[in-house]
Amino acid sequence: KKCWKKGLLYKGFDVVPWCWRCGTAISQHEILTEDYKEVSHKSVIIKYPVDGRNNTWLLVWTTTPWTLPGNVAVAVDPEKKYVEAKKAGENEVYYLIEEAASKLKLQIIKSFKGKELLGLTYKSPFDDLPAVKKALSGYAHEVIANDPFILPISETEGTGLVHIAPGQGAEDHQLGKKLKIPTIDLIDEAAVYFENLGEFSGENAKENPEIIFNYLNLANVIFDLPQYLHRYPTCWRC
């Protein structure tokens, strides 16, 4: 009652960990205390074409490729050092964090702070899917600033440009609510893609990850598909 009177309670939406196999939510406490397994997943570094800049791309890394149709924005750290870089002998220009350029053996053209990327808009290969188009409702994919308290950006892992899907990730959802950007719903309780998502509709996102890679390959937007070894929470009920 006191919390209500102080205006501390509200009705809204949130993201919770969910086991698609047994159809149950998993509490944060269970994730913190129950089993983790070391697993290897195929991640993806996707190329997003920057609007108004010929042959210029954002390099964005994600360990959850199934969420890419839900991409709404890309986050950068305004104060960290980013670069414009390219592969030797090639014309494509990429934006990414400085440390990642060295790891990917790219030639650095120039460096600058992340804030110079803010406001750039880009296209996603999933934009023509009916459900995506409806959810975005004219919103242009944009480079946004991270919130270090919600989503800190690493200089040692990934590309420094973070895929933001407010309908799928907890930190993404928090940042999306703060910035009032759209949410794209992708899957049901059994991890099956909803209707109006083109060839993905009816497919299980967790059992058939290759459908995303095949789609990206046809769109010619894959920069790399690195294997990623990490500790991953598992459902104790399964």
PLM features per residue range, with description:
Residues 1-69, 132, 154-238:
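Residue patterns forming the tRNA-binding/recognition surfaces of aminoacyl-tRNA synthetases
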Residues 70-72, 76, 80-188:
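Catalytic alpha/beta core of large soluble enzyme barrels
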